[in-house]
């Protein structure tokens, strides 16, 4: 049973009890800072994560809907943008009655882990398991637990939404399928023509095996069992090509998976909650989509 004082304080909860799977000794220490190079107000950046955590943001009791979302911030698998793609998003979900969990997943590094290409997925699956197994404590419906990701966090979320087989044998009997996905300017593909090669290099290496490229090109992994998905992208995104979202959407349609895609004309990459080039609020559209799919009342 989790300590309610920890939950109310929005304290980071260790993702694993005891020894970290796939970890090996290294000199890195957890580190975060405010980066002002990208925007004047600065963004919260985490560039070293040795102990993955999950932080719960609970809505007021009178607003609870029983729906939950696990949020994976982006950062090219080299950093995590923990503020505008993490905590800020969790807080607006709370206003809609959704319990939100911000995941600080391990960043793939050969010197700190074995089989680095599977470690972020391992952490995402552990987060899904954690939330489902603690659903009563969080007043959550175990059948309304989704995963959300921005940029490379969208790659991780879409990987979790297309790869249900457990990375760890310890979770062999667990239900690791998210009930829905929300993907915001996501990296989807690792193929040369549209893939984000920085994310690919960090996760599977600069000269990857073609089998790994296929495995982690999630537009090629969609099946009828893939969960309903809401996608947002900007047409002028020169960081992660909009074809990532378009091809994933096409794969969802082909497999008759409920899906909705919002393509802005402008907005670029990394706008978080606020695409300032338009009056359209993608988050409101997302909430409406969740209601239409009976994920929210």
What is the meaning of each model-derived region?
Residues 1-11:
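Bacterial Sec-dependent N-terminal signal peptides
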Residues 10-63:
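N-terminal cap/lid segment of alpha/beta-hydrolase-fold proteins
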Residues 33-39, 186-221, 227, 254:
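Mobile cap/lid helix-loop segments that gate and shape the active-site cleft of serine hydrolases
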Residues 65-74:
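Short beta-strand element of the alpha/beta-hydrolase
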Residues 80-82, 87-90, 105-142, 274-281:
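Catalytic nucleophile-loop/oxyanion-hole region of alpha/beta-hydrolase
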Residues 122, 126-195, 213:
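Primarily recognizes the serine-hydrolase "nucleophile elbow" in alpha/beta-hydrolase
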Residues 231-233, 237:
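Short beta-strand/loop motif that positions the catalytic acidic residue
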Residues 242, 246-297:
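C-terminal catalytic histidine-bearing segment of alpha/beta-hydrolase fold enzymes
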